[in-house]
Swiss-Prot record:
InterPro entries registered for this protein in UniProt: aa-tRNA-synth_I_CS, aa-tRNA-synth_Ia, Leu-tRNA-ligase, Leu_tRNA-synth_edit, M/V/L/I-tRNA-synth_anticd-bd, Methionyl/Leucyl_tRNA_Synth, Rossmann-like_a/b/a_fold, tRNAsynth_Ia_anticodon-bd
Organism whose genome encodes this protein: Afipia carboxidovorans (strain ATCC 49405 / DSM 1227 / KCTC 32145 / OM5) (Oligotropha carboxidovorans)
Keyword Aminoacyl-tRNA synthetase carried by entry: yes
Main subcellular location: cytoplasm
GO BP terms in the entry: leucyl-tRNA aminoacylation
CDD domains for this protein: Anticodon_Ia_Leu_BEm, LeuRS_core
Residues that hold ATP according to the record: K639
NCBIfam families xrefs: leuS_bact
GO CC terms, sorted: cytosol
Keywords of the record: Aminoacyl-tRNA synthetase, ATP-binding, Cytoplasm, Ligase, Nucleotide-binding, Protein biosynthesis
Molecular function, one GO term: aminoacyl-tRNA deacylase activity
Motif ('HIGH' region): 43-53
EC number(s) given by UniProt: 6.1.1.4
Name of the protein in its database record: Leucine--tRNA ligase
């Protein structure tokens, strides 16, 4: 048997080829075994995988291999989230077609992923940019449209005047386009929307059923949906100041208890009343236009200076018609939340306080903290938003906030005002539930996306593309010679005959948001060969939901929430029979690395520097010049700070198994892992150690472990092996991979001693117990280090592939300890512990207790009055 070092560069490609040739990881839709669907969020084909990919996909692979060994029919597919702006940028910069760029990147990344030894079913591979995929996405768009889940409407968007395209809120940085740097404008555009808001309450309440999701993610979605209960209050406008035909403004508030602290009413710049007043007020018109020159992102609005324009209108307080409140147009009020109008209570809302301090409107506290003197309680620069009792609020004084809210609601529900459009009176207020969640605008002015299957006809209006004509394919002869949407400029593609009247018409030139592509790919994986429908109902309902979904927490809201909505929309249109796509969700931590900075402030890559010394004496220099380099903070790996490690370099030097092992071993999987060369080298030493143990033992081992027995000689090793197996199994099932690896590290120590023991060559029972322990070790490391495990399995003469071997069974008998430690009390107080045989008779236990130093000291040579032994619980010595 060879004892040469394990050579990953030779071993790993060999086993990868064998797995491919045998189709080991193919999943069958007609398999009778219980299914287990494990999925990692599929990647964007940027051209290179990074260490975050290595960590993410290794975790999923461990779960897949473990579940396969446990007897499940495992579905573990891979695909490509392939549409998106980077491909268009590459086309503009490199004069390359987005499709060519994308598919070249897919080929490169697929090769890299295969080098990791992932147990993927590549037969199910999909790319969202392929017409065979987006054909079905277009079909579902039409189904959603027919079901009333899609609508076309005007919407405020962030418009980049240089790139001539809509920007997502996340693409607006300090008021400028992320790519062009141009000042972003607000524009009113006609957009296509998915009506996710119809599912607000359902999406919210169903979060309680997702008990295998991180609580943090559920809370983030809950806050994003933003359910709020409040009052819709009608403020009558002072007739002397109001435009003709305007008599009131409606305000939604979650704090009706603070009405007596009101100092102003504020309208959104997009409120119809603001527009009406602006017709006769050029200065207000200019102010509204200035508001529109800023982005629509909530974060930008929250951090911007609070600006307002006094319209001259005055609103009457709901409880006091003589109390007139100034009506402003304010840049921080959003039209798409509530009614687009608020009343401001500055003492108890920081945004309102900043506003009144700027415009000198003052504030009146109406909630006083418990224990504070109401007479001396004042607000200056910091609003009070805590609990307390009502003050300065007339009939509400002394009430709790909750009681005050209810009292206000009851009073205003019974009070009335004339209806704005005539026809008698109506209540001043009514209870209402609002949601922060807005409909999902999916229109993008991009080429490289899924075409929206709609035709615009002057005679017939909006006409769906007939299903028989799907897919609507993107044209190949496209030019990226200037900004904007190339589909708008295409000479022929957008011109088409109307399917209804045959007249001249044009195609919809917007494409779908790429989040649509990733909102159903998990369902397509269940039967990607179905050419006639997005899903095969029998198959998708059997294989879904995904049992374990793995990805970054940065997708907690958009992707995961959109997927939950999309699944419900698919159910409503008959494509699936379930509501939730992901039964279990795990969000892994990032891969981080030190940063290094040159004297000129530029970043240095880890491959360019040499680090010497330890602790405070640790320092870095450039390899080429010897110039000193500043060792900076540990941060997420990023190209901009050049603190990245190329997975190809690590796999080429140490092998995929070393990279996988290190990624799993160094920290809990939900926390960041700090990349270190020392840690990788330590992982590689363990690879070599396992290989050495197998090679040393293999020539002396029997074919099986039948002769191991449970003698006093062999039981300790066997018990250690079975205890390790139980612990590793539990850790993997809980996704505590670092804990599993720690148990395996600990197990190798006694296993090494057992192999070095002379009895290996002389005692058949001993050799059989070593055989069992090694077999178990190899099968336990197989999910983490599959190539090494296959090589060791072969060296041990194992049957078939370890990738197809069953997970070992724990013998519960071997988990029972032979000894037990009992507390020893003297006159009811614990003084010592005694370790005895688990089934030792009382006289033996009593003798062991009397031999303890603590008992001897207490007795001082005397005989105890009695010794009480509670079997396997406690011993009490009565002196």
């Amino acid at each position: 048997m060879s004892t040469e070092r394990y050579n990953a560069r030779e071993v790993e490609p060999r086993w990868q080829q064998i797995w491919d040739e045998k189709g080991v990881f193919a999943s069958r839709n007609d398999d009778s075994r219980p299914k287990y669907y494990v999925l990692e969020m599929f990647p964007y084909p940027s051209g290179r995988i990074h260490m975050g990919h290595v960590r993410n996909y290794t975790m999923g692979d461990v779960v897949a291999r473990y579940r396969r060994a446990k007897g499940h029919n495992v579905l573990h597919p891979m695909g490509w989230d392939a549409f998106g702006m980077p491909a268009e940028n590459a086309a503009m910069q490199n004069k390359t077609h987005p499709a060519k760029w994308t598919y070249a990147n897919i080929a490169a990344m697929k090769k890299q992923l295969k080098s990791m030894g992932l147990s993927l079913d590549w037969a199910r591979e999909i790319a969202t940019c392929d017409p065979s995929y987006y054909k079905h996405q277009q079909r579902m768009f039409l189904d959603f449209l027919k079901a009333g889940l899609v609508e076309r409407k005007q919407s405020k968007v962030n418009w980049d005047p240089v790139d001539q395209t809509v920007l997502a809120n996340e693409q607006v940085i300090d008021g400028r386009g992320w790519r062009s740097g141009a000042l972003v404008e607000q524009r009113e555009l006609t957009q296509w929307f998915f009506k996710i808001s119809d599912y607000s309450e359902e999406l919210l309440t169903a979060l309680d059923t997702l008990d295998r999701w991180p609580e943090k993610v559920r809370l983030m979605q809950k806050n994003w949906i933003g359910r709020s209960e409040g009052l819709l209050v009608r403020f009558a406008l002072d007739a002397a100041t109001a435009p003709a035909g305007e008599s009131e403004v409606e305000v939604f508030t979650t704090r009706p208890d603070t009405l007596f602290g009101a100092k102003f009413v504020a309208l959104s710049p997009d409120h119809p009343l603001a527009a009406e007043v602006a017709k006769a007020n050029p200065k207000l018109e200019a102010f509204i236009a200035e508001c529109h020159r800023h982005g629509t992102a909530q974060a930008e609005i929250d951090t911007a200076e609070k600006l307002g324009f006094d319209t001259g209108l005055r609103a009457r307080h709901p409880f006091d018609p003589d109390w007139l409140l100034p009506v402003y147009v304010a840049n921080f009020v959003l039209m798409d939340y509530g009614t687009g109008a608020i009343f401001g209570c500055p003492a108890h809302d920081q945004r309102d306080l900043d506003f009144v301090n700027k415009y000198g409107l003052g504030n009146t506290p109406v909630v006083c903290p418990e224990g504070q003197d109401p007479k001396s309680f004042v607000i200056t620069d910091t609003a009070y938003d805590g609990d307390g009792r009502m003050i300065n609020s007339r009939f509400l004084d002394g009430m709790t906030i909750a009681d005050a809210k209810e009292d206000v609601a009851k009073r205003l529900e019974t009070a009335t005002l004339p209806r704005a459009n005539g026809g008698g009176n109506a209540p001043v207020a009514k209870r209402q539930v609002n949601y922060r969640l807005r409909d999902w605008g999916i229109s993008r002015q991009r080429y490289w996306g899924c075409p929206i299957p709609i035709i615009h006809c002057e005679s017939c209006g909006i006409v769906p593309v007939p299903v028989k004509d799907l897919p609507v394919k993107l044209p190949d002869d496209i030019e990226f010679d200037r900004p904007g949407n190339p589909l708008d400029r295409h000479p022929t593609w957008k011109h088409v005959a109307c399917p209804q009247c045959g007249g001249k018409a044009r195609r919809e030139t917007d494409t779908m948001d790429t989040f649509v592509d990733s909102s159903w790919y998990f369902a397509r994986f269940t039967d990607p060969w179905n050419e006639n429908a997005p899903t095969t109902r029998k198959v998708v309902d059997a294989m879904m939901p995904v049992d374990q979904y793995i990805g970054g927490i940065e997708h907690a809201i958009l992707h995961l929430l959109y997927s939950r909505f999309f699944t419900r929309a698919m159910k409503a249109t008959g494509h699936v029979g379930f509501d939730e796509p992901f039964a279990g969700l795990f969000t892994q931590g990032m891969v981080v690395h030190e940063t290094y900075k040159n004297a000129d402030g530029s970043w240095a890559a880890p491959s360019e520097i040499k680090i010497e010394g330890t602790g405070d004496a640790r320092h870095a220099t450039l390899i080429d010049t010897g110039a000193p380099v500043e060792i900076g903070s540990i941060e997420k790996m990023s190209k901009s700070k050049r603190n990245t490690i190329d997975p190809d370099d690590i796999i080429g030097t140490y092998g995929a198994d070393t990279a996988r092992w290190f990624m799993l071993s160094d920290s809990p999987p939900d926390r960041d892992v700090i990349w270190s060369e020392e840690g990788v080298q330590g992982a590689n030493r363990f690879v070599q150690r396992v290989w050495r143990l197998v090679n040393l033992a293999a020539p002396h081992l029997p074919k099986d472990s039948a002769a191991a027995g449970t003698s006093a000689d062999t039981k300790p090793l066997r018990s250690t092996a079975h205890r390790t197996l139980a612990d590793v199994s539990q850790a993997i099932e809980r996704l505590r991979f670092n804990t599993a690896i720690a148990k395996l590290y600990a197990f190798v120590g006694p296993l090494n001693e057992a192999i070095d023991d002379p009895r290996l060559k002389a005692d058949p029972a001993w050799a059989a117990s070593v055989r069992e322990a090694l077999d178990m070790l190899v099968r336990m490391i197989a999910p983490m280090m599959p190539h090494l495990a296959e090589q060791c399995w072969e060296a041990l003469g194992g049957q078939g592939l370890v990738s197809e071997a069953a997970w070992p069974e724990v013998d519960p008998v071997l988990l029972v300890e032979d000894t037990i430690t009992l507390p020893v009390q003297i006159n009811g107080k614990k003084r010592a512990d005694v370790t005895v045989g688990r089934n030792a008779p009382n006289p033996e236990i009593e003798a062991a207790v009397l031999a303890l130093d603590a008992v001897k000291t207490a007795l001082a040579g005397a005989t105890p009055r009695k010794i009480i032994v509670v079997p396997q619980r406690i011993v009490n010595v009565v002196v």
